[in-house]
Regions:
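Solenoid-like repeat scaffolds
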Residues: 13-16, 100-102, 147-149, 179-186, ...
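Amphipathic alpha-helical repeat scaffolds of TPR domains
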Residues: 19-34, 60-82, 105-127, 150-164, ...
């Protein structure tokens, strides 16, 4: 999914052979939408249109399958690009289905068709109650057919993990995850990919290892070709985010904190400012790690953040409120609660954390803070009700990996029930948690 590097490679191929139709096709393809960035900025749309024209111009030199891919890609773009890309993306997926029917023995064609279908519902292949969304069964069937043709096809294994990870049976992709571990050892994102299935199947230590390897690869690549730019920054951050989360779930607090701090430090300030609506929530992650391990003094020692990070500024108050409540400093906790409510109101509605809005995540934090504070004040039932509300809101968040809330609310609710000697209720909460986080 390193589209920038792919474009550079295709451009070099086109420089060496200006009449190579597939080099121009590749540039046009890589400028298009994908599940992690379902947009086409105007400069990318213009370049895609130009390169598509060159691919069509030189298509006579291409094979029949390549000509079919070029013809299908022509359905994906228009000049000028419309405000609503939906009809173009659907037309491209439909065209790729026909190409796959014509060339059912070509695994690349099948993988590109599956991706075109996934792009119609990015990160939304399964409903909250575990039912496949429209098109999901076709995606899975296509990828399984591709893997019968080429079991080690990198893209098909990659997409298969994404296709089933949010399903009720993520273990379907365990074999694909294991194949991915050493399939492309120089590509950090693909080294990391098995952890998407590991953490859904309770293989937490394997998830730690996969992401440790991925982080080592991304650092080695930075030494070879320079620091990452653009969206690649966030792919690298994602590896460390996933590593920290898996470390949290295995009780490795120091390891989690090491990598979450490194993740934050490696995002340049200028990139934070330019991409604040995407990056803001990443910067808040150290608070969740510290809360997980009850490191209250460290939470309270962290400084405030710039105004261009409104979510992190708000989350800081929530974390401080929980820390003060845990230390029995109720008045200070109330002050932070008031500050959190005021700061959360300033978070723009379009700020996001992965597949969720920052405001939706703030709502989980609001109920967590209220629950912890009420519980510490001795209002046990009220506190438990707020924690249960936090659980409900966490469950309603859209699927993402790592989860948008990496401090499982059921763990806090279960601990509170244990302290209240409501052991049967606590046991049920923990059993429910194991369904979500085995």
């Amino acid at each position: 999914f390193n589209h920038g590097a792919a474009i550079s490679a295709f451009k070099e191929a086109a420089r060496l052979d200006p009449e190579c139709a597939m080099a121009h096709w590749g540039i046009a393809l890589a400028n298009g939408p994908h599940i992690n960035f379902p947009f086409v900025p105007p400069p990318a749309a213009e370049e895609a249109w130009h390169e598509l024209g060159l691919a069509q111009k030189y298509a006579e030199h291409a094979s029949r399958a390549e000509q079919a891919l070029i013809d299908a890609l022509a359905k994906r773009y228009a000049n000028p690009q419309p405000d609503d890309r939906g009809p173009l993306d659907r037309a491209y997926a439909d065209a790729m289905r026909e190409v796959w029917k014509r060339f059912p023995k070509d695994p690349d064609v099948g993988a590109f068709f599956a991706e075109a279908m996934m792009d119609l519902r990015p990160w939304n292949q399964w409903s909250h109650d575990g039912k496949p969304e429209p098109g999901t069964d076709e995606i899975i069937g296509t990828l399984e057919a591709v893997l019968k043709l080429d079991l080690n096809h990198p893209f098909a294994n990659h997409l298969y993990i994404h296709a089933v990870e949010a399903s009720p049976h993520p273990e379907r992709a365990l074999a694909a995850a294991d194949r991915m571990r050493d399939l492309q050892p120089g590509i950090a994102h693909n080294v990391h990919m098995p952890s998407h299935i590991d953490i859904r199947c309770g293989r937490w230590f394997e998830a730690v290892t996969a992401n440790e390897k991925a982080v080592a690869v991304q650092h080695r690549n930075a030494e070879l070709v320079g620091p990452p730019q653009g969206i690649l920054l966030f792919y690298n951050a994602h590896n460390q985010h996933m590593l920290a989360y898996a470390a949290m779930m295995t009780g490795q607090g120091d390891l989690a904190m090491k990598h979450i701090k490194s993740m934050v430090a490696e995002i340049p300030e200028e990139s934070l400012k330019q991409l604040a609506m995407f990056a803001d929530a990443f910067i808040a992650m150290p608070y969740e790690v510290l809360l997980r391990f009850g490191r209250w003094d460290e939470v309270l020692a962290l400084p405030d953040h710039p105004e261009y990070l409104p979510f992190t500024r708000a989350f800081r108050h929530a974390a401080r409120g929980i820390a003060f409540a845990a230390r029995g400093e109720v008045e200070s906790a109330h002050a932070e609660q008031e500050a959190f409510v005021a700061a959360a109101a300033l978070v723009p509605p379009d700020d996001i954390m992965g597949n969720n809005t920052a405001r939706d995540i703030d709502e989980v934090a609001r109920h967590m803070l209220a629950g912890e504070l009420l519980y510490r004040e001795g209002r046990i039932d009220d506190g438990l009700a707020e924690l249960r509300a936090a659980v409900k809101l966490e469950d309603a968040l859209h699927y993402d990996e790592p989860p948008p809330w990496i401090l499982p609310t059921r763990h806090s609710l279960g601990a509170a029930l244990m302290q209240a000697r409501r052991y049967a209720e606590a046991e049920q909460v923990y059993r429910d948690d194991l369904v979500h986080l085995p």
